[in-house]
């Protein structure tokens, strides 16, 4: 008699995805981030659901409702801070997951990679709209500045911005629709995750060497379920430490001031995970040019499979490419720092140089060095 997990229509899907799935025997802890992202999404949906039960998406009461959650709702404060810092954890895992994909050549699985980029955009959109909901100063002005960027689009720009706002400024209509979309998008993300996994399981996982591992596979359970549980434990521990010891470490103090359209904060900046893109946006003096650079800074990931000129898939045995990869990481950290600084000397020129280096590394230097390595190895 066949085991029920192998014959039952529903259990069979779970079995083929989480239990009997053949996985390479040599995948390292860098492969843990997929499951960690799944846990992050689960935490965000759960905490968000309970927060939505007490939140009101009205400009007159939104700020007060968040205060009410923190002060009067049982364990409301921990829900709110788990949700806010859970987003930061989500992005840490996302960046590491994408970085892993770049380093080990996972982008060769083009369908999985492209769905992943779509997921990245969806998560960024969700996080941006979520930041607007507490209706603090930075929420209001962040929403105003970022949505206003669309006015740089020729001909339809102004109409598009007013259509998104639902009026002539960020107001009640904007907050209500942002709340609606912020609630809806995580479920769309969950559906996209299923598609992402579907494409991944068509090809099987990559591994650190970049060499096909068909001849050396092990079952996902118990080996990688245990490994994922250890990663999850570490991440949840880090998240709880952040929430319970310094919940406002990654937030902006200006967001504890209720939104005031008549008073602009001295430095308008987004959450830390958008700062690298914000720095690229600010480094170009032209508005449309800046918006294009902002979009391309993420969209450039789509070109990765086309820019792969090496005969080897992974960077594991390519020291020159490794140097450029870590230079790219350092460059992104520099951009993140610059994004949080005021627009003045010397930050302007540092931001411009870091932006030029970012695009040069991905479009020119890394493909060129890969060709050079092929010649050095006489391939």
UniProtKB/Swiss-Prot annotation:
Pfam families: Cytochrom_B_C (PF00032), Cytochrome_B (PF00033). SUPFAM superfamilies: a domain/subunit of cytochrome bc1 complex (Ubiquinol-cytochrome c reductase), Transmembrane di-heme cytochromes. GO terms for molecular function: metal ion binding; ubiquinol-cytochrome-c reductase activity. GO terms for cellular component: mitochondrial inner membrane; respiratory chain complex III. A ubiquinone binds at residue 201. InterPro entries: Cyt_b/b6_C (IPR005798), Cyt_b/b6_C_sf (IPR036150), Cyt_b/b6_N (IPR005797), Cytb/b6-like_sf (IPR027387), Cytochrome_b (IPR030689), Cytochrome_b_C_euk/bac (IPR048260), Cytochrome_b_N_euk/bac (IPR048259), Di-haem_cyt_TM (IPR016174). Component of the ubiquinol-cytochrome c reductase complex (complex III or cytochrome b-c1 complex) that is part of the mitochondrial respiratory chain. The b-c1 complex mediates electron transfer from ubiquinol to cytochrome c. Contributes to the generation of a proton gradient across the mitochondrial membrane that is then used for ATP synthesis. The cytochrome bc1 complex contains 11 subunits: 3 respiratory subunits (MT-CYB, CYC1 and UQCRFS1), 2 core proteins (UQCRC1 and UQCRC2) and 6 low-molecular weight proteins (UQCRH/QCR6, UQCRB/QCR7, UQCRQ/QCR8, UQCR10/QCR9, UQCR11/QCR10 and a cleavage product of UQCRFS1). This cytochrome bc1 complex then forms a dimer. This is Cytochrome b. The lineage of its organism: Eukaryota, Metazoa, Chordata, Craniata, Vertebrata.
